[in-house]
From Swiss-Prot:
Any single Gene Ontology cellular-component annotation: membrane
Keyword NAD: yes
Function: Involved in the biosynthesis of the osmoprotectant glycine betaine. Catalyzes the oxidation of choline to betaine aldehyde and betaine aldehyde to glycine betaine at the same rate.
UniProt cofactor(s): FAD
Disulfide bonds: none
PROSITE patterns linked: GMC_OXRED_1, GMC_OXRED_2
Protein name per Swiss-Prot or TrEMBL: Oxygen-dependent choline dehydrogenase
Keyword NAD attached: yes
Region: Disordered, residue numbers: 182-201
Amino acid sequence: MSQEFDYIIVGAGSAGNTLATRLTEDAGVTVLLLEAGGPDYRFDFRTQMPAALAFPLQGRRYNWAYETDPEPYMDGRRMECGRGKGLGGSSLINGMCYIRGNAMDFDGWAELPGLEDWTYLDCLPYFRKAETRDIGPNDYHGGEGPVSVTTPKAGNNPLFHAMVEAGVQAGYPRTEDLNGYQQEGFGPMDRTVTKNGRRSSTARGYLDQAKKRPNLTIVTHALTDRVLFDGKRAIGVTYLVGDSEERVEARARKEVIVSSGAIASPQLLQRSGVGPRALLESLDIPVVHDLPGVGENLQDHLELYLQYACTQPVSLYPSLLWWNQPAIGAEWMFNGTGIGASNQFEAGGFIRTRPEFKWPNIQYHFLPVAINYNGSNGVKEHGFQAHMGSMRSPARGRIQVKSKDPRQHPSILFNYMSTEQDWQEFRDGIRLTREIMAQPALDPYRGREISPGADVQTDEQLDKFIREHAETAFHPSCSCKMGTDDMAVVDGEGRVHGMKGLRVVDASIMPLIITGNLNATTIMIAEKISDKIRGRKPLPRSTAKYYVAGDAPVKGKPMREVKQG
């Protein structure tokens, strides 16, 4: 059985749903959207309630639950690499932080040959196009887009305000909008949540407006086996439905677009015969095109938590107790309000640790409870924590297919903490975080340091803590990078080098990881490239002003000095 469409999109995630929605705005264009996971069940609180964000990571229904190979610089730990499975992709299970990256990230991309139209001012109109911000549009934010963005409001947890004030007291800037004129500094953090308190995944935002169109066909539980080629032209795909071993074939008249994410996109290309020749030949995969960069240049954000006891009963600790959860769930279900309606990452910041960094190299997420991101190891008392992570590690990893079997996970290695810069940034980051947490704004709340613990002071002690406790921020990217050099996989429009009718459009095509969470930027990339595919003129460049640190000092004098080992 074979079906024919103009475009086949592999992966209904942040990029794939955006592309499917935009391409089918043209009524004469037919699109097949394939998703290996299931629907985004709207009555499943695990994916729809913002405060329940840890639940999908604990199971396999919505999570691919990849693991890395033993990471050599992390005591050989096999580390989590959760990715979303189901309509919405990772936007169905992420932390819902709406952060776009720093303007300098995109200006840096645009300095690379062939990527001249990826400057921040070229990208900003597409960020705005995708967004509806609840407090209204301005030069930086949209008011008519599919992605619902909610801003923190007065009356939220007092710890958010105290942690931002502590950052300012430590000598860093205050910013009212981490996606506006100035990212650098501390301030409120927007979230992809609807006005009714539901997760704003791309399934809800984009597919809800597109799924009834007669020119869009969506198939869930459809695991793409490989891309089919006629010479160097992509002509279709084969896929498996559910547990069946029968391969279904679909043909593409125009293009196959791979939007499977930074892990699965290179895996699919390699399995289809597009990738490093030696790897493919070692697995008896017929080589369609020797493209050495497929699966290389893999990047991520690593982070750790600094946890503190809270001396006042204002943290979210009571919400972790089962007997309080029915009332929280009921308020969220019927009113769309309360603790359940927030991801609880309502404040954060970006700082530079040293003058050689021209824009922030450390990100903070503040959380008014002490618990692991995946919901494990909750501290059994009132507490709060700062998630601290480096933004642009020089470490580079890789994805390698292990077999022709589409159900076998690939070999994943990030090489976390493999450079001296990594260690310097994390040591600096821990010490600067302690200085922030010691400021007067937190005096009414701060108890003992739970983790790492006040006795962890020397470089050696900090390094041991980092090796044992640092975790992924779940931001894999850059494994099919845009560019023109020998290791580039696609051009500035996502077209695979040396091939015809084949694109990759998702976080894997970022040439360098951005300063912040990836979801908003992945959607922007898909919005921008969809105009290219449709032959539309790009949106006019923005004229908005944006902050460049230049010679500005990294920080001012802290209100309270802290002596550390």
